[in-house]
A protein has these predicted regions:
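Active-site core of glycosidic bond-cleaving carbohydrate-active enzymes
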Residues: 1-182, 187
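C-terminal beta-sandwich/jelly-roll accessory domains of carbohydrate-active enzymes
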Residues: 187-206
């Protein structure tokens, strides 16, 4: 994502690792994925599903270098991204936390499942420093709770959920009017995190 100035002109200099300026607490690496309402449209702008997948892949493998830009110093979100050592993926701050689930929209759900499990296992724990960054209105813990259940609301306000990789063999959500939503993950284990087939009320779900 390349920013424009106040007159609607493209900025004359682009550095994908530059924080600040047009990007709040992040860089182009993070805000490029903020088309939560239209992942398919984003993929077409990027040249299709394969091209978008390659860009997502590169976020996790690129050097975790940075330019602190208009901030003028290394803010804690930058320091956390470097410490997490997952390329340019900065789970310690909220703007990019949904990006892992975008693989679902471009036909590569196993990559969502892989990265979701990696983040839950590597960046969260029950100790005094159990969060990998700031919490900001409960988003970082909400990401974990949804991901542990096996699904995630990529676009706020839309009653749709992207599928991840449930952490538990079985969990039950108690819904209004005495109803339950039960998630069963047969054969679930840290090494067996990929979903071979999903059923919803007995019918195959994709």
């Amino acid at each position: 994502m390349w920013a424009k100035d106040a007159q609607g002109r493209w900025r004359d200099r682009f550095d994908a690792t530059e924080w600040g300026g047009p990007f709040t607490e992040g860089s182009s690496w993070h805000w490029t994925w903020s088309v939560l309402h239209d992942p398919e449209g984003l993929s077409q702008l990027m040249g299709g599903h394969a091209s978008m997948a390659a860009r997502l892949d590169s976020m996790f493998t690129a050097p975790n270098t940075y330019n602190y830009g208009t901030y003028g110093f290394v803010i804690h979100e930058i320091a956390e991204m470097v410490a997490l050592d997952m390329g340019q993926y900065a789970h310690g701050n909220q703007p990019v936390q949904h990006a892992i689930y975008l693989y679902d929209y471009i036909g590569r759900p196993w990559k969502t499942q892989q990265h979701v499990r990696e983040v839950m296992g590597k960046l969260y724990n029950s100790g005094s420093k159990g969060y990998c960054g700031d919490e900001d209105n409960g988003q970082t813990s909400a990401w974990y709770v949804f991901s542990a259940m096996g699904f995630y609301p990529v676009c706020p306000g839309v009653p749709e959920y992207a599928m991840g990789s449930p952490l538990f063999p079985k969990l039950t959500l108690h819904l209004p009017h005495g109803k339950n939503f039960i998630v069963k993950a047969e054969g679930n284990s840290p090494a067996n995190c990929y979903i071979g087939k999903a059923l919803l009320n007995g019918s195959e779900f994709t």
